[in-house]
Amino acid sequence: MKKCLMILLIVMMYGCQSKEQLNILVPQGSPAMTILGLDQSIYKVDVVNGPDPLVAAFGSGSHDAIIAPTNLGLKLYQSKDLYQCAAIVVWGNYHLVSSRFESFTIDDLNNQDIIVFGQNQTSDIILKHILAFYNITVTITYVDSVANASALYVNNPNQIVMVAEPSLSQLKALVPETKHIDLQTIYQSLHHDQSFPQAALFVHRDLTEDQIRKLIDNLELSIHDVNDEKDDLLSYGVSLGIVNDKNILKNAISSSHLALILALDAKDELDTYIEIILDLNPALIGGSMPDLSFYWSDES
C-alpha cells in the first residue's frame, strides 16, 4: 500500500512539474536571439520560420507565450484576444545596405532604386515614413522575404537593399565592403529618441500573474546575457540555426537592438508606431488603436 502511494505521489509531482514548463513560440531571426538564455527545463521553446505558425498559435492558444512582430500580435488581438502584449523585446531591426558608396548616408538615397522586402508590411512602412520626412524620392522594387533581398544583394552589392539582422551580419561577412544605414537610428532622430517596437512578448490570458512576472524577469535576464555575448549562448544560437557562425551571431546581436521594456512603459513608443501604421496601412493592425486591455499589467 505504501509503495502504491509513493508511486502515485511521484506521478502527481511529475505532472505538476510538467505543467510548470511553459511553451513559447518564437520566429527565427532576431526574436530567437532573445530566448537563448532561458532555462530549457522551465521553458520549451519552438523556433519557427515565417508568419503562418504564429498566426495559427494566436488563433488556437496553443502556446503559453508568443514572441512575434508587434503589428501581427495587435492585428490578431483585434479578432481574438487570447494574448496580451506584455513587453517589447526587439527594437527596430531594419537596415539598408550597399557597397557602392564611400560613406553611405540617408542623403545618398534620393532618386535611387531600392530593393525592399515585405510590400505594405512594417519594413515598407517604416522606410516610407523616413523617406517622406526627408522628402526623398526613390523607386522601390519589392521582394517577398529578407532571404530573397539578401540573395539579390550578394549577386550585385552595388544595389541598395533593405535587410534585417542576422542577414546584415551575414552579408557583411560575404561582402566586406558593405556599408549600411541603421533605420532605427534614423527613426530615433525623428521621434525624440523613441525606438520603434518591432517584436513583442505576448502572454496567454490563462497564465497566472506569477508565471508572467517570472517569464518577464527570466527573459530580461536572457536578453542581458545575450547582449553580453556569452559564449555558451552564442553556441546555442548557432545550434538553433539563427546563423552558422558564432562571430556572425555576435555581430548580429549588437545591431538587433534587443531590450525588454514592459508594454505599458513603452506605450508612447507603441502609440507613435501604431499611428504611423494607421496612416499608411490600417489593415496591417486591424484598423484601429488598441484599448488598454491589449496591454498586460500586473496591476490589472
Language-model segments: which ranges?
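C-terminal motif of bacterial Sec signal peptides marking the signal peptidase cleavage site
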Residues: 13-15
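Periplasmic-binding protein-like
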Residues: 88-98, 177-205, 252-256, 292-299
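Short, glycine-/small- and polar/acidic-enriched structural segments
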Residues: 21-128, 132-134, 141, 159, ...
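Sec-dependent signal peptide recognition
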Residues: 2-7
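Secondary-structure end/capping motifs
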Residues: 206-280
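Bacterial signal peptide processing site
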Residues: 17-19
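Conserved C-terminal helix/tail region of periplasmic/extracytoplasmic solute-binding proteins
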Residues: 271-300
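Pocket-lining segment of extracytoplasmic ligand-binding domains
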Residues: 145-236
